[in-house]
Structures are given as C-alpha cells and as structure tokens.
A protein has these predicted regions:
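Active-site glycine-centered loops adjacent to acidic/histidine catalytic or metal-binding residues
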Residues: 6-7, 118, 156-157
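ATP-dependent adenylate-handling ligase core
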Residues: 122
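Extended active-site neighborhood of metal-dependent phosphoesterases/phosphodiesterases
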Residues: 1-113, 128-141, 162-207, 212-217
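Binuclear metal-dependent phosphoesterase catalytic core
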Residues: 170-270, 275
Length: 275
C-alpha cells in the first residue's frame, strides 16, 4: 500500500510533532530518512472543540523525505507521491527533488507517469478551495506536470469523487493530465459543489453522494482504462443523522485513456510551462 501524507497525519495538537505516527506506522520507499522538526503554533489552525485532536495546517510544515514524498516504479508506470503539506514552492527541497525525479524518468521504459498527493489541484467542490495547498499547487506544480506530460494526478482530501478531462490551465486540452479526486472511500461528507447546477468545463464526472473506489489498468504504452466503482450510499437522513448504509456495487464511471505522451498536437506554448 502506497499512501500520501494527509492533514489527518500531522499528529496530535499537544505534541507539536509532525508525522510521528505516520512515520512509525507506514514504510514507504524512502529517498532518505525523514527530516522532521517540531511545529510552532503559527503553522496551524487549532480546533475550537475539545475533541479536535489533530492539526489543520494553514501553511507548510517542517517535514522532508521519509514517508512525506517518494517514488516507485510499478510495471510500465512511474509513480511520484508528493506531500501537499511540505513546501513545494520553487527552490524548496521537495520541488528540487520533484524536478530531478521527472528529468530522470525514461518514458520508453515507464510510458505512464502518475502523480499522487493528498490535496487536488482541481476541485469542483466548495470545501478547502482557498487552502494554499491547492491554490499554490495550481501555480507551481501544474506547469511542471504539463511540461513532463503527466498522465494522471490522483488526490483525495475532498470526500467525494471527481474526474476531469485532460486539462491545462483550466481548459480542456488533450495533452494535459487527467485530475482525479478519489476521496469517497469511507467517510460520508456530501461535499457541496462550487456550482450546483453547472459543472466547470473541465469536469467530466463528479459525485458527492456515493462511496466508491477506483481502478487503473494499463494495457500497453498507449492505452489505459480508469474505472470508478461505487460501493453504496447512505439512505435519507434519519433523525438528523446519516441514514443506514445501502450497498450498491455497480460501475459508475469508466473511461479509456490515450497516453498524452503520444498525442500529436501543436507544441505546448512556452507561457504554459513557466514555473
């Protein structure tokens, strides 16, 4: 199991430690041992209720390497897992590591390039939309992903499902990555949409009512298939609470993807690649 650092992994509000349980519980393919420093109060929003036991970060935390970010190869795919909560701004340790990783990817060996991180770059949902971990990623990471023809950017954070068409700078473009939010695996949240009636032009599928999981099959160097399978939903509210779980194991979204690396279009304009 390969996972990405989430806001729920930033540890207990009383310890001021970063990622201690996350480092001890999981073992990812380390680039090098983790570098973690104690947090300071100004890094976090503190919960207003006594039972709020973990941090909500408002800026980047002092956590590098270890389980925070890493990469691995699986068959014909190169996977790069990033930390949304370690700085990824230009010149940061993580950003420099990411650039080095991407520059050394051999697409003749691993033609599929997949990025995973907790916070999405694109979201049709209202919650978290102003967090810097999303807004700054669009500014500083999207141009890098586009330049290197990343195929998929897979995230969570929002407890719902979303799939975009290949997108560059908020416009459908066959050369751009497909952005997926697969955050509806367990927690019911009914994330509100930014616009209830009309989805953004880069949206292909969005859903905030179902639980589910996704699968990605890589058939060859040019074609892959993504599926989102729903597992159920909560019935109508009962007494102000979420209703009883209703199983429903049916296919809810399926798409065949042509590897963007082989899309023959005009070169991507230089201004789209600026960091």
């Amino acid at each position: 199991v390969q996972i990405a650092l989430g806001n729920h992994d930033l540890d207990h509000k009383d310890t001021m430690e970063i990622g201690t349980a996350y480092e001890k519980r999981f073992r990812m393919p380390h680039v090098q041992p983790a570098i973690r420093n104690l947090a300071t109060n100004d890094l976090f929003y503190k919960g207003e209720t006594p039972d709020f036991e973990y941090f909500q970060a408002k800026t980047f935390v002092p956590y590098e390497f270890g389980n925070a970010y890493y990469s691995f190869v699986f068959g014909p795919s190169k996977h790069i897992v990033l930390s949304s909560y370690s700085s990824f701004l230009p010149g940061s340790i993580q950003h420099e590591w990411l650039l080095s990783e991407l520059e050394h990817v051999d697409r003749s060996v691993t033609p599929w390039l997949i990025i995973m991180l907790h916070c999405p770059l694109y979201s049709t949902f209202h919650d978290h939309k102003r967090e810097i971990f999303m807004t700054e990623a669009r500014v500083h990471l999207e141009p890098v992903f586009v330049r290197h023809r990343v195929n998929f950017v897979v995230a969570g954070h929002l407890h719902s499902y979303m799939r975009t068409v290949p997108t560059i700078d908020s416009k459908p473009d066959p050369r751009g990555p497909i952005h997926i939010i697969q955050g509806n695996g367990g927690r019911q949240a009914n994330e509100p949409y930014i616009n209830d009636t009309v989805a953004e032009e880069w949206i292909k599928v969005r859903d905030h009512s179902m639980y589910g999981y996704g699968t990605l099959e890589l058939f060859n160097r040019t074609h892959a298939r993504w599926k989102w399978v729903k597992t159920g939903f909560n019935a109508e509210d009962e007494g102000g609470l979420h209703g009883r779980f209703q199983p429903d194991f049916s296919l809810n979204d399926e798409v065949w993807v042509t590897n963007q690396l082989y899309v023959d279009e005009d070169p991507i304009p230089d201004e789209s690649l600026e960091m």
